[in-house]
Design a protein with these regions (language model features):
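Disordered, acidic Ser/Thr/Pro-rich linker "stalks" and the adjacent N-terminal cap
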Residues: 27-80, 93-98, 151, 160-185
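Exposed beta-strand and adjacent loop surfaces of beta-rich binding modules
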Residues: 39, 85, 99-103
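Hydrophobic loop/turn residues within beta-sheet-rich immunoglobulin-like superfamily modules
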Residues: 79-82, 135
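Intrinsic disorder/low-complexity segments in short proteins, especially the signal peptide
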Residues: 17-19, 41, 84
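Beta-strand-rich structural segments
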Residues: 87-90
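Sec-dependent N-terminal signal peptides of Gram-positive bacterial secreted proteins and lipoproteins
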Residues: 3-27
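Trp- and acidic/polar-enriched beta-sheet ligand-binding modules for extracellular glycan
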Residues: 44-48, 68-74, 92-165
């Protein structure tokens, strides 16, 4: 009986210990970002043969929109209603053919695009991810490609638009980068 009691105590102690350990394991909520542009209608300045405008928002990163001629070319997405947004992703053709310069505009009507919410002139990424410092709202989102690297036509697999809680990270300042002012007498 004594052996049985010790076994029960050992099992209970182990169970309680495991419960404490397991309760310390962090649990992360899965966050999913909804692509506001998914399956929405795209309008474009030009399209080439078997690479039509609908490929830009079809959710398939194996189909693409392409133009026969080079920049400046544009595509705008009608989201169907006004949304807040702050993150944009563009999936360009490949590592040697991508937009090196582009602008993104957001509007509630097709007549007044205003100033771009983002202008990029130094892109070197096949997947361009842009996060704004603050959210903007609108029904229409326009991607204007002004320069391409590689082949001259514009070629993009997907244009994704998100409303996310992500924040732009502040730059990290290093004390070694800060200099004291020089005093002169």
């Amino acid at each position: 009986m004594k052996l049985k009691k010790k076994s029960v105590v050992a099992v209970l102690t182990l169970s309680m210990s495991m419960g404490s350990v397991l309760s310390m394991v962090p649990v992360f909520a899965e966050t999913s970002q909804q692509n506001l542009a998914l399956n929405k209608t795209a309008y474009v300045s030009a399209e080439y043969g078997t690479m039509p405008r609908k490929n830009l928002t079809d959710g398939n990163e194996k189909t693409r929109w392409s133009t026969e001629s080079g920049p400046t070319q544009w595509a705008y997405i009608d989201l169907g209603q006004e949304y807040e947004m702050n993150k944009f992703q563009m999936f360009w053709e490949n590592e040697s053919t991508y937009a090196s310069a582009y602008n993104i505009y957001v509007s509630n009507d097709l007549n007044s695009w205003g100033e771009p919410v983002l202008s990029r002139t130094d892109n070197k990424n096949v997947v361009s991810e842009e996060l704004l410092g603050s959210k903007v709202s609108g029904r229409y989102v326009k991607l204007e490609v002004t320069e391409m690297k590689g082949y001259p036509n514009v070629s993009c697999y997907e244009f994704k638009i998100f409303n996310t809680d992500e924040k732009v990270q502040d730059p990290i300042w290093s004390v070694s980068n800060i200099t004291s002012p020089t005093r002169t007498t």
